[in-house]
C-alpha cells in the first residue's frame, strides 16, 4: 500500500514546509516530526493521515 512515490510526496511536503518527519507539521499535525508544530495543530490532515499515524 505504501508506494515509494507517496512516501516521497510526504517527504517533499515536509521539506517544503520546513518540518521534518512525515507529511510535515501542517498536514501531519506533528505526529511525524514533533519538532515542527505541536500535536493537535493538524487540523488540515491530508490523505496521509491514516498511513503515517504511528499510533
UniProtKB/Swiss-Prot annotation:
Keyword terms, alphabetized: Antibiotic, Antimicrobial
Gene Ontology biological process terms from the UniProt entry: defense response to bacterium
Chain segments carrying region Disordered: 18-55
Amino acid composition bias (Gly residues), ranges on this chain: 18-39
Feature: compositional bias, Basic and acidic residues: 44-55
Biological role stated in the UniProt entry: Has antibacterial activity against the Gram-negative bacteria Klebsiella sp., Proteus sp., E.coli ATCC 8739 (MIC=72 ug/ml) and K.pneumoniae (MIC=32 ug/ml). Has no activity against the Gram-negative bacterium S.typhimurium or the Gram-positive bacterium S.aureus. Does not have antifungal activity against the human and plant pathogenic fungi F.oxysporum, A.fumigatus and R.solani.
Assembly and interaction partners: Monomer and homodimer. Might act by homodimer formation.
Name of the protein in question: Glycine-rich antimicrobial peptide Pg-AMP
Lineage, broadest ranks: Eukaryota, Viridiplantae, Streptophyta, Embryophyta, Tracheophyta
Amino acid at each position: 500500500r505504501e508506494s515509494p512515490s507517496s512516501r516521497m510526496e510526504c517527504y517533499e511536503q515536509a521539506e517544503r514546509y520546513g518540518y521534518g518527519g512525515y507529511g510535515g507539521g501542517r498536514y501531519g499535525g506533528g505526529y511525524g516530526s514533533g519538532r515542527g508544530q505541536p500535536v493537535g495543530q493538524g487540523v488540515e490532515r491530508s490523505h496521509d493521515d491514516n498511513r503515517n499515524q504511528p499510533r
